[in-house]
Amino acid sequence: MSSPTRWEIFWRTVMGRAYPRVVGMQRERSWLFFDTVLPLLQVSAFVFIYRAIQAPPEFTGFVVLGGAMTAYWLNVLWSMASQFYWEKETGNLELYIIAPTSLMAILLGMAIGGMVATTVRALAVITLGLLIFRVEVSIVNVPQLLGVFLLTLLALYGRQAQHLSNLLQEPVFLVSGFYFPVRALGFIAALGASVIPITLGLDAMRQLLFPTMMAQFRFVDVRIELGALAVLSIGFLWLAKRALSYMEDLSRREGRLTIRGQ
């Protein structure tokens, strides 16, 4: 019997790490409630604020879309960026390091599984938001909309971090314009926030879903944002690879695979 090739091991690892996240969501049905109904409460708060000040109805759509994309940012922070730190605390990180497979394959499997599980929450928020608040959308270009969405996810899931999760959660909600057009911060501030992929992704998707209102609030042209997202995707994936290699080398040289006293 022949040994599996390098690529076979890679894709088996991806499927093995994606499986628990997809199946776990189905086995724990309460997660579906907490991940779909409860996030609508925060979305509803912003919707009622906009309606109280008699903002244009498109702003309700901005909030619903931002609330749905919040699911992906939180998944990146707590199910990706902090994952290896938690694995270190539970004693599993050393098993990942010595396993005869790629750490990138492990993270890719985690990302794919997380995307599938998180997409259920995001679709539920969008569907319920559209039905409850009667949001009207006008899709300008479906291929561009899908391209922006996929590139935003690719760039987001290329990011890695540890204890920065708490530090980044709320500030990113502000500077990325989750609940308002990022151009409202000013062009310079929006340009600085563009290093965060979801900033460009949200602005582009809003332009494609609410073209009339976004004509006066758009940051830059959608095609420019698509190109920037493609560059960010490649850049963050390269940085993730370098960070993983550095972490692996440091852990082996200095013995940091486990916490002290474990």
How would you describe each model-predicted region?
Residues 1-262:
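Hydrophobic transmembrane alpha-helices and immediately adjacent juxtamembrane helices
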